[in-house]
Amino acid sequence: MVTLKMAIIFLMEQIRTPFSLIWTIMSPTVLFFFLHFNEIELHYGDTAWLGKQISWFVGYISFSVVLFNYCLYLVGRRESGFIATFVHNMDGRLLFIRSQLIASLIMSILYVFFFILVVLTGFQASPDYQIVMIILKSIYINAFMMVSLTFMASFRVTFQTASTIYSVLITVCMVSGIVSLKYNEGIVYWINQVNPIAIYSTILQSDQELSLMTIFFYSIMLIISIISALTFKTEPVWSSQ
């Protein structure tokens, strides 16, 4: 019950930032229609085709939420000195992280649902089993990614530095994903083996499977993140300077 109450508080705080909310929702939606504008008439009402096209965009939206609505919020609350006032033991740390994870997971569901709804409306297509599975898969992938990447919120850096790191990371992932459409060899191939956006896209498409390298890499990240959550520092960086 306490977890749910805190999750609702954190969720309401995220909703109260309208510019970030609108930008996260609208930017990939506008980009999708920009890239597929000439195909609206050709694939009018084609839900099966849309299901294959939206996986990468769902991955981008979801990974953005993981980085900026989850990891960055954890860093921001730590650096504001907010959690140091009431989190003094492991139970408190886990309660805080768990509540933020639930709030961010709800936000990711809203983002993905809105994006898919707008795309289906634009193409006058009806949702089918494939679309429902994409939404359900995105939920459990988001939950896993948030848990696996929790260690990124434990870096002892300032909020601004963390924001810069996350921005660079999502840009690299986005660019490598786009480049792989034309060239997927060498370093581009290896980056995409651990690229969260590419992993989302792979899992959301039922005819593709993850490589052993990807599974091994994220298993290690999961273990590191569990340790990071248990030892999460609540004191802001500036307090020790």
Swiss-Prot record:
The chain crosses the membrane at residues 17-35, 54-72, 105-123, 131-149, 163-181, 212-230. The keyword Transmembrane helix applies. It is found in: Cell membrane. GO terms for biological process: response to antibiotic. The keyword Transmembrane helix applies. It comes from the Bacteria. Keywords: Antibiotic resistance, Cell membrane, Membrane, Plasmid, Transmembrane, Transmembrane helix, Transport. GO terms for cellular component: plasma membrane. It is a multi-pass membrane protein. Together with two further proteins McbF and McbG this protein causes immunity to the peptide antibiotic microcin B17 (MccB17), which inhibits DNA replication in enterobacteriaceae. Immunity is determined by two different mechanisms. McbE is involved in the production of extracellular MccB17 and, in a complex with McbF it also serves as 'pump' for the export of active MccB17 from the cytoplasm to the periplasmic space. This is Protein McbE. It comes from Escherichia coli.
